[in-house]
Regions:
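Conserved, well-structured interaction surfaces
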Residues: 46, 79-148, 161-167, 184-187, ...
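Bacterial Sec-dependent N-terminal signal peptides
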Residues: 1-31
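Inward-facing hydrophobic residues that define packing positions of alpha-helical scaffold repeats
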Residues: 49, 106-109, 172, 179, ...
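Elongated scaffold/linker segments in the mid-to-C-terminal portions of large proteins
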Residues: 93, 229-356, 360
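Acidic, glycine-rich segments characteristic of secretory precursors and extracytoplasmic regions
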Residues: 22-65
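Short, surface-exposed recognition loops and adjoining beta-strand edges that mediate ligand/DNA contacts
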Residues: 35-36, 62-77, 152, 188-269, ...
Length: 394
C-alpha cells in the first residue's frame, strides 16, 4: 500500500512538472478556429471585411437619429418618454453608448488597418480594398466623435493602454490623413453597398466644409456630383426608394446593407412600428411645417415620402404594413444610409457662397419641388437660410 502511494505521488509530481514546463506553450496556442493575422488569405480578408461592415452597421445606426432628437424634430412616441433629448453629459446613457460603440468598432477597424499595413502583398486588389475600407471607416468613426465631442483619444492600433484625449485639431488632421490614404487605395464606385472612392470624396467634402476649407469642399462634392452613377430623385416615389430594402436609388453614394439574421437594426421600430408603441413621433411643428410651401418653393416631393395621415408616425422607413407611401418588402433590411447625392449639392452650394453657389442650389431645388422661384441674387444670410432649410428637409 505504501508503495502504491509513493508511485501516485511520483506520478503527480511528474505531471506537475510537465504542466509547468508546457505553460508557456499553452499560453501561446491559439484557438483552433483562429488564423494568425499575418497568415490571412484573400478569402479570409473578404470574410473579415464582412464582419467589419456588420460592426459599422451597428455604429451608424446608433447615431442615425441623433440629429433629429437633439434638433427637436422628434417628441416622445407612444409608450416612450424623453427626459432631456439635448443632454450631452458624459453620464447620459445615449452619449455613453455612442462613445463606447465608437471604440468597440474602432478595435475591429484597426485590425483591418493593421492587416493591410503588415501585408507583403499590397498590390492585391483585395488587400487594397481592405486597407482603403479600414482607413475610410476609421475616418468616419472619428468624424462622429469630433463633431460631437471635439477632442478624442487617437488610436492608430489596437491597444488596452489608457490613451489621453488629443486636441480637436489633431483629430481633424488624423481624419484627413486617413482619408488621404483611403483615397489612394479605394476603387471607383460599382456598388452602393460597398465603400468606394466616391464615398471617400463625400466624407472629404463634409470634413473640408466643417474646417471652412471651402475651395476643397466644393471640389470634392463636385467629384461626386459629376459621376454618372448618381442622380437626385425627382419624384416622391424615387425619394422614398432610397429608404427601402434592396434599394436601387441613384441618390445613394453609400449605404450599409443591413441584411442581418440576428441583432436586427429596425428603423421602423423607432418611428413607425406595427405595434402601438414606438420611441419617437414628429414634433407638432415638424409635422405641420417642415414641408410647407414658401414664397420661393412649392410642392416638396419629400413630403409624401416622410409623413402620412397619422401625425404620430414617420413613414420614411416603411414598416411593410398598411398606411405606407411605398412598399418595403423586407422592413427589417432597410439600408443604413451613410452618404447621399443631395448632401453633395448642398455642400457645394454652401462652399461656393451666395454669388457662385446660387445656380447649384437652384439645380438642386428644381429636382425637389414642382415650382421654384428663387431670385437672381441673394444676400449671404438669405442664401444660408435656404441651405439650412433644405438640410432640415432632407
Amino acid at each position: 500500500m505504501k508503495r502504491f502511494y509513493m508511485i501516485n505521488y511520483l506520478l503527480c509530481g511528474i505531471c506537475l512538472l510537465w504542466m509547468t514546463g508546457c505553460s508557456n506553450m499553452l499560453d501561446e496556442m491559439r484557438p483552433k478556429d483562429k488564423i494568425p493575422q499575418d497568415a490571412l488569405s484573400e478569402s479570409d480578408l473578404t470574410k473579415l471585411l464582412n464582419g467589419v461592415y456588420a460592426e459599422m452597421e451597428e455604429l451608424v445606426f446608433k447615431f442615425y437619429m441623433d440629429g433629429d432628437v437633439k434638433g427637436e424634430n422628434f417628441k416622445a412616441g407612444p409608450g416612450f418618454s424623453m427626459n432631456d433629448p439635448m443632454s450631452m453629459a458624459p453620464s447620459s446613457k445615449d452619449v455613453l453608448g455612442q462613445w463606447q460603440k465608437c471604440f468597440t468598432a474602432l478595435k475591429q477597424v484597426n485590425f483591418l488597418v493593421e492587416t493591410y499595413e503588415a501585408s507583403s502583398n499590397k498590390d492585391s486588389q483585395v488587400v487594397k480594398q481592405t486597407g482603403g475600407t479600414g482607413y475610410y471607416f476609421r475616418a468616419l468613426i472619428y468624424y462622429h466623435l469630433v463633431t460631437r465631442g471635439g477632442g478624442a483619444p487617437i488610436l492608430r492600433k489596437r491597444t488596452y493602454d489608457v490613451v489621453p484625449i488629443s486636441p480637436e485639431a489633431d483629430v481633424w488632421n488624423f481624419i484627413k490623413e486617413d482619408l488621404g490614404k483611403a483615397e489612394s487605395l479605394l476603387p471607383e464606385f460599382t456598388d452602393r453597398f460597398y465603400v468606394s472612392l466616391s464615398v471617400c470624396d463625400a466624407l472629404n467634402a463634409k470634413v473640408c466644409l466643417a474646417l471652412k476649407d471651402y475651395t476643397n469642399a466644393a471640389i470634392y462634392a463636385d467629384r461626386v456630383i459629376t459621376k454618372s452613377n448618381f442622380a437626385l430623385s425627382t419624384t416622391s416615389a424615387e425619394y422614398a426608394n432610397a429608404f427601402i430594402s434592396n434599394s436601387n436609388s441613384k441618390e445613394l453614394i453609400f449605404a450599409l446593407a443591413n441584411k442581418r439574421s440576428t441583432g436586427l437594426l429596425l428603423f421602423y421600430q423607432s418611428v413607425n412600428d406595427i405595434d402601438p408603441t414606438w420611441d419617437y413621433s414628429p414634433s407638432a411643428d415638424c409635422y405641420s411645417h417642415l414641408y410647407a410651401d414658401t414664397s420661393v418653393k412649392k410642392q416638396d416631393i419629400r413630403a409624401k415620402a416622410v409623413f402620412g395621415a397619422d401625425n404620430s408616425r414617420i413613414i420614411k422607413f416603411p414598416n411593410g404594413s398598411t398606411g405606407q407611401f411605398v412598399t418595403n418588402e423586407q422592413p427589417s433590411q432597410t439600408p443604413i444610409v451613410v452618404a447621399r447625392e443631395a448632401e453633395m449639392y448642398l455642400i457645394k452650394a454652401e462652399a461656393l457662397g451666395a454669388t457662385n453657389g446660387l445656380s447649384t442650389l437652384k439645380e438642386f431645388m428644381n429636382k425637389r419641388y414642382a415650382t421654384v422661384s428663387l431670385p437672381s441674387s441673394m444676400s449671404d444670410t438669405e442664401f444660408q437660410n435656404q441651405i439650412l432649410d433644405e438640410r432640415h428637409r432632407e
